Amino acid sequence: MAYEISRQQYGELYGPTTGDGIRLADTDLVLRIEKDLTAKGDEVGFGGGKVIREGMGMNARMTRDEGVVDTVITNAIIVDHTGIYKADIGIRDGLIEGIGRAGNPDVQDDIDIPVGVNTEAYAGEHTIVTAGAIDTHIHFISPDQFDTALSNGTTTFIGGGTGPADGTKATTITPGEWHIHRMIEATSDAPVNIGLLGKGHAAVPGPLKAQIRAGAIGLKIHEDWGATRSAIDTSLRVADELDVQIAIHTDTLNEYGYLEDTIKAIDHRTIHTFHTEGAGGGHAPDIIAIAGEKNVIPASTNPTLPFTKNTVDEHLDMLMVCHHLNKDIPEDVAFADSRIRGETIGVEDVLHDLGVFSITSSDSQAMGRVGEVVLRTWQVAHINKQQRGPLEGDSEGNDNNRIKRYVSKYTINPAIAHGISHLVGSVEVGKMADLVLWEPRFFGIKPKVVLKSGQAAYSEMGDSNGSIPTPQPVTYRRNWGATGAASETAAVTFVPSVALQSGVEDKLRGGRALLEARDMREITKKDLKHNAATPKIEVDPQTYQVRLDGELVEGSKPTETLPMGQKYFLF
């Protein structure tokens, strides 16, 4: 017999459903649930008097071999490039096994996710689930970055470095076969996935190919090592041959040529441009114009996101430290000053909102903050709604188009750029269960639990001597998915196909899985999700004003206050 309850009571029991809205933290952004894959009246939930019990929502006879999942997240609100919807999520063997309706197929109809004796449960009611963030601009300066990044929902690191060397402080590069092998070994117990970038500075292919065969999934070109046209062309020729990505930080000083010369050297080949606005480095003053090229995958680093009253002031000191400059040398100060333009920093926010800039990343400990990639991405979304209004197709109470655009910037798009989207980057069946669970009031700021391959790797946790898990002080701590041998099984290292074919596993110590990064050379900007716009961009060299397709762009105004800020970090 059917039983009717109010929408409010339903929400209290099972969480919001189709058409309901949820405010993201203290921002002006409101998501609206597009569909609900659970069955009204047949929902499952865990706890005393709830449905997941023997003979009810939990099957008591099926074995794991018969398809029972290892873990279920019930009634979750999924926020992903694929949509914003409610569903149960099943996890098995560290992968997403099913998204839909969980329960006991013996007593419930149309079950996609069998729940049984083998199944652990997370109560996803009133919880938002996203894919783990992928940070493509990591300086491997300190292992402490892992925990800091996990605390904001980042589960994959792509970048380079060897520790606190001056080369690493300035450039995201792990140079040469020896360093690449040592860093793969050093990160074998890291609680995040790893992908390394080698040094893309050679006049002949040999030294570059050796680094890729050693396990680098890409090469980085950086002005501090000389962003020459020869280095660009040689790296791209090798990349096209061996299927890896090229990342570039172009020549601020325009010593080796201007922006037009770099574009000519790239010659329509796919490339990932770092901090494309320019404050992080690149052709002054017009590197931002490269974001309009169809073969360019443009990214931002987070110190310029969003544009605030403090952004310009803090950049000078950051530049001096990170790029080994001397404040007593006028030329060094002039070099640093040439990279900082409030006009283009403001436009960067707008280009993110228009889907011209496609990726957000950190530039960890080297002009960026590794624990704020997700947070700052949503701050940009907020200030753009505040200053520019709803996106086309959105409204004051429905920001789904904007939300899908911004979540894609740190999940699926970096995965596509670096050839790992078949494994991570979205909440889809068959992908690694790198999932972040958020309470809506803390969305984008402090996750409830971070799962790595379906295991709890990082979570908020109360006093270990408490009689329950919640007594103060509640702090973030590693959990079982980041301890013991689980550190090697829950996370992976990405390497190119040619490295696997070359037997790189036999040259390394440690038991961590090496998975293939692939298909990086045929992609263009049109393959990126919700962020594929390619307008013609022009920069006035005197005023730094920016035009899109001939129209003057008004950048965001430097904001004085932001959501997701200090009120969340008092304790």
Curated annotation (Swiss-Prot):
Binding site for Ni(2+) 2: K220, H249, H275
GO molecular function: nickel cation binding; urease activity
Catalytic reactions on record: urea + 2 H2O + H(+) = hydrogencarbonate + 2 NH4(+)
Gene Ontology biological-process entries: urea catabolic process
Residue sites binding substrate per the record: H222
Cofactor note: Binds 2 nickel ions per subunit.
Main location: cytoplasm
The entry's keywords: Cytoplasm, Hydrolase, Metal-binding, Nickel
Covalent S-S links between cysteines: none
Recorded superkingdom: Bacteria
PROSITE patterns: UREASE_1, UREASE_2, UREASE_3
Associated pathway: Nitrogen metabolism; urea degradation; CO(2) and NH(3) from urea (urease route): step 1/1
EC number: 3.5.1.5
Subcellular location: Cytoplasm
Residues reported to bind Ni(2+) 1: H137, H139, K220, D363
Active site: H323
Family annotation (CDD domains): Urease_alpha
Gene3D superfamilies reported in the protein's UniProt record: Metal-dependent hydrolases, Urease, subunit C, domain 1
Modified residues (N6-carboxylysine): K220
Residue ranges of domain Urease in the record: 132-571
A GO CC term assigned to this protein in UniProt: cytoplasm
Assembly: Heterotrimer of UreA (gamma), UreB (beta) and UreC (alpha) subunits. Three heterotrimers associate to form the active enzyme.
Family to which the UniProt record says this protein belongs: Belongs to the metallo-dependent hydrolases superfamily. Urease alpha subunit family.
Name of the protein described by the UniProt record: Urease subunit alpha
Organism encoding this protein: Corynebacterium urealyticum (strain ATCC 43042 / DSM 7109)
Gene: ureC
